[in-house]
């Protein structure tokens, strides 16, 4: 391995000192090969792969020798070109004859001879040209005759053109019979450029070894050129940027923009041309004042650089039928004042009419950014507009008009408008509303009715009125708040609330039955003032009080019933009512109308089902049921409450359920009980004629927790003979009322 490396190293040195390479450097004077340079086989045309270290060494050695020993050789020098071709002709047959991938090195004596020849030739070189200039001359495409060459300070010379160079690149078409070609591989930044040299062939006519002009690779858009000196890199970089697609597109767009005129320039230019034509046809001067202001102090109409309806060849110019774009004269029927009304959607119409014998030029200008602050109405001009029109009218009145000019038909409205030596009157602005109807389709395409309703199209004088309304409301609200400022401070209100809540806790054991109406009513009675605007403070005080008094020992005793706080807590929120609450409330109902109603205990039906009549026989020992008019029997089926009523006068057994459920066996059990009770009490009239009914048109619950509350409300309404005027939304209020009634041991109306 070491021996092979040594052989390759020697061959590299020999190749670097060979006269063929020196002739190449001396003749080209622009090429040096910093990376891979190898020969192709004549038949295969493939580059020879060198070892990496050998390539690096060969590159460095070649550069060093070329910089130190070889001096610049002018192009087309007969002695040097002959020497180069002679050396090439002596070396080329060896390469072609060997037909191997290794380079053929010369002997040590040949190497010395070639070195002596190079030294002698170097001494006789002409030092007139420096290396940089000679490189720029020989660079393909960057000769002294080009623009870039002149920019770098080079004068045009009579050197051979790049088109005479016998060099081909991989981009050119090559015949399959070409042989003896050298390929230059440029792998800088992973870009491979193949250049096939035909100058290394056996030159019988001793022509100089000159490369061809380079070409651009159209597919990759990368210029395939030989490596040049570092001083040419900046020129090549600038040239590449100059030829880039983005730069060319940008420059093309700039040229197009410069070539195109704005619509304002076109309009003014077209009018000036038309006026010049009219002047040549007429006798004296232009009847229409020029658009270019002669006096800087004189007001002239302003043409904004935006889409408008000005006459001319603008971008959005509308020309009526029967007139060409070059004709600035518009008749009455197709004039622009007929198409657009005055000041509609921010448009201001300027009318110049000198006399009945002169043509009339009417121009409408659309102003989007300048609102008319002085006159919000649509039939008046602004003062600045009137001054401009007055100046233009006076200027037009002084101009002479010939009699040979064509006269246009003018309507009565236009005749009243036209004046020779005065300003334009305000009448055409008012009459244009009637002339709009002639060309309504064109108007609707530009001026939409929806735009007129837009807030930006309204008069700016209306804005203060809109802005003043919230201020008035704020003042009124501020005055109301100042009037309702309560003289009662928070401390007094808190003290009063605390005393009232103490009374509620003492009477009801909790704040469950307390409602907002009760609190506000009590405060109004104390302070003779409405505290509805201070509800947040009141609610905060109640919450703090409830946190300090969470639970107390509160009990209710009524007859044989006793309720504690756990029983009363079932009435809070959406809790299920228990038997103690149902039974005690039924006792209150029964005591409210003792002669008519009898309320059975909630355990009655369960005892009847489990033990029969004998289990409940003693429950009615002191009561004659058949002397009552209504019997109320609550049915508790584990998780649901229902009600069975018995109307003794009509012998009807009814079933009430807040969910629409009908338990037939419950009704049958009650019917059997009544028959047995009639026999025991010796009441034969009640042994027959019993009927059962299911009541459906009654208030229904919409949750799963208020069935007990509905049953108690059914009982109360039936006992007091009141209609069912309640619903699910009334259940929170009904719960509070039941709580109060239980605590007070009486029914509240």
Swiss-Prot record:
Q: Which InterPro entries does this UniProt record tie to the protein?
A: Papain-like_cys_pep_sf (IPR038765), Peptidase_C48_C (IPR003653), SENP3_5_cons_dom (IPR045577)
Q: Tell me the keywords, alphabetical order.
A: Cell cycle, Cell division, Hydrolase, Nucleus, Protease, Thiol protease, Ubl conjugation pathway
Primary location recorded for the protein, binned into one broad class? nucleus
Query: Does the record bear Nucleus in its keywords?
Result: yes
Q: Name one GO biological process term.
A: cell division
Where is this gene product found? Nucleus, Nucleolus
Q: Which residues form the active site?
A: 640, 657, 707
Q: Where is the composition biased (Basic and acidic residues)?
A: 268-279
PANTHER family hit by this protein: SENTRIN-SPECIFIC PROTEASE 5, SENTRIN/SUMO-SPECIFIC PROTEASE
The subunit field of the Swiss-Prot or TrEMBL record says: Interacts with CCAR2.
Protein's recorded name: Sentrin-specific protease 5
Q: Which organism is it from?
A: Mus musculus
The gene behind this protein is: Senp5
